């Protein structure tokens, strides 16, 4: 599958992604994606039935940057902290071709949300289904599909999952 060095890079990609989201360092979020990278948030029921409807579908790094602008400048909401708990990634496949190495991996996640004046609750849980490619800057997401378990989300999704 993958050698230890590559797997260690994969672990760092997942943990660094979670830390950027948890520290609200939104400007760094797009850096995890290649220019044509996609980010989608989809209910498990739709995914398992092959239905394309997503709660959120960002089709390029430019759209991901626009989302960052929205989070920082235009969206009004009760502020909250979030904490990602991400399982160890499981490598599903590795392909090598003229464009380089492409890893398909998945990892379970839970996002805990804490309102400044309230309790901590599980906001979203599911798994990431990722396609990761090697670039001169290291491993980057070609696509991140967040498949969440519940059909309903208790409130709007503001921050990245």
Swiss-Prot record:
Disruption phenotype: Cells lacking this gene are not able to convert salicylate to gentisate.
Residues in coiled coil: none
Pfam families: SnoaL_4 (PF13577)
Listed GO CC annotations: catalytic complex
Binding partners and assembly: The salicylate 5-hydroxylase (S5H) multicomponent enzyme system is composed of an electron transfer component and an oxygenase component. The electron transfer component is comprised of a ferredoxin reductase (NagAa) and a ferredoxin (NagAb), and the oxygenase component is formed by a large subunit (NagG) and a small subunit (NagH).
Role this protein plays: Oxygenase component of the salicylate 5-hydroxylase (S5H) multicomponent enzyme system which catalyzes the 5-hydroxylation of salicylate to gentisate. Active only on substrates with a ring-substituted carboxylate group with an adjacent hydroxyl group. Primarily active against salicylate and substituted salicylates, but not against 2-hydroxycinnamate, 3-hydroxycinnamate, 2-hydroxyphenylacetate, 3-hydroxyphenylacetate, 2-hydroxybenzophenone, 1-hydroxy-2-naphthoate, 4-methoxysalicylate or 2-hydroxyacetophenone.
Name the record gives this protein: Salicylate 5-hydroxylase, small oxygenase component
Gene: nagH
